């Protein structure tokens, strides 16, 4: 990894890496870690320690999950409150209802041990 970053910086001195765990084209980390909260926190911690400007795909900080291979399931609306945990009118029409294991942002803000905190 260091070798690649050194080569990138030599090719472009203004190079800034942009590490990420997942995005709209990939499965969310919660699925990769099978909803294991400690593994998800560890992955996020590693990403934040990498050089560059890390990108957090919306919902990663809550443990939001996607399911299947449909793009629409990777673009579900952010769930700010418990009311948002079911499929909302803002969800893409072809999206499946995806059960979320972790609480909403509103609920996680109150829990000092949550993924968000």
Stretches with model-predicted labels:
Residues 2-24:
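Aromatic-lined glycan-binding groove of carbohydrate-active enzymes
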């Amino acid at each position: 990894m260091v070798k690649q970053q050194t080569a990138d910086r030599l090719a472009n001195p203004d190079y800034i890496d942009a590490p990420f765990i997942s995005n709209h084209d990939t499965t969310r980390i919660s699925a990769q870690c099978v909803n294991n909260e400690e593994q998800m926190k560890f992955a996020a911690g590693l990403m934040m320690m990498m050089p560059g400007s890390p990108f957090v795909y919306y919902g990663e900080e809550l443990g939001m999950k996607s399911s299947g291979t449909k793009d629409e399931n990777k673009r579900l609306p952010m769930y700010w409150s418990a009311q948002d945990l079911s499929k909302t009118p803002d969800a893409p029409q072809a999206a499946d209802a995806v059960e979320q294991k972790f609480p909403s942002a509103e609920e996680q803000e109150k829990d000092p041990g949550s993924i968000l905190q």
